[in-house]
Regions:
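PRPP-dependent phosphoribosyltransferase catalytic core
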Residues: 1-79, 84, 131-204
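A short glycine-/small-residue-rich loop at the edge of a beta-strand within enzyme catalytic domains
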Residues: 120-121, 152
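Short, glycine/charge-rich flexible loops or terminal/linker lids adjacent to PRPP-binding catalytic cores
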Residues: 60-111, 121-127
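Generic enzyme active-site microenvironment
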Residues: 115-116
Length: 204
């Protein structure tokens, strides 16, 4: 089982993520909003919005959760991904916008929203994050009218997670470097039964 584990260096991780972003942002006129996926509350939205109709989003986007706020928390892939989007914005600040405000989304005519994450497992957390966009009235309107499209960039994903995320209401296009090795796709039926039996014996 240990032989099936795949080691990924931070350098390889960054190179692959950068390449996938470049693949999406292939038009000179593209205006890109960049976000890094994180845990969210059930009722969280990207922007505040007017409760009375017409509901209109306003103000700053919800913030990233930075590990540097609490030094007890180790900086992992989330820190790397935030560094990546910072570099893209510095590379071309007229094309890339990190966590843009609702006003910038309108004035700059953002047409692509890219959400970065390290891996897609079950797809639960990413789906909740995507729902924050769908539950923000102005963004929902832009998505429905085709003014913006959502893209998800990750290093690896399970086939199950991909199938769930692709059914999200935001209709995201998912770009990934590789499929995650799982017990189902890495072993034969006989091998799976053997490992499951061993695991059961250990638990007992």
């Amino acid at each position: 089982m240990l032989k099936k584990i795949q080691w990924v260096s931070s350098h390889e991780f960054e190179v692959k993520i950068n390449a996938l972003i470049d693949e999406i942002c292939n038009k000179e006129e593209d205006k890109i909003a960049l976000f890094v996926e994180r845990e969210v509350l059930d009722d969280e939205t990207v922007y505040s919005f007017n409760t009375e109709k017409p509901q209109r989003a306003f103000g700053n986007a919800f913030p990233p959760i930075l590990s540097t706020i609490d030094k007890k928390i180790e900086i992992g892939s989330e820190g790397i991904l935030n560094n990546i989007i910072t570099r893209f914005q510095r590379l071309d600040s007229r094309k890339y916008y990190n966590y843009p405000s609702a006003e910038i989304m309108r004035s700059k005519r953002i047409n692509k929203v890219i959400i970065l994450t390290d891996t897609i497992g079950s797809g639960n957390q990413l789906n909740k994050y995507l729902n924050c966009f769908w539950n923000t009235p102005s963004i929902k309107s832009w998505l429905s009218s085709g003014h913006i499209n959502v893209y998800v960039v990750c290093f690896a994903a399970t086939e199950f997670g991909l199938s769930r995320v692709e059914l999200n209401k935001t209709k995201p296009s998912v770009f990934y470097s590789r499929i995650c090795p799982t017990i189902d796709n890495s072993f034969t039926n006989q091998e799976r039964k053997k490992y499951m039996k061993s695991a059961t014996n250990i638990i007992l």
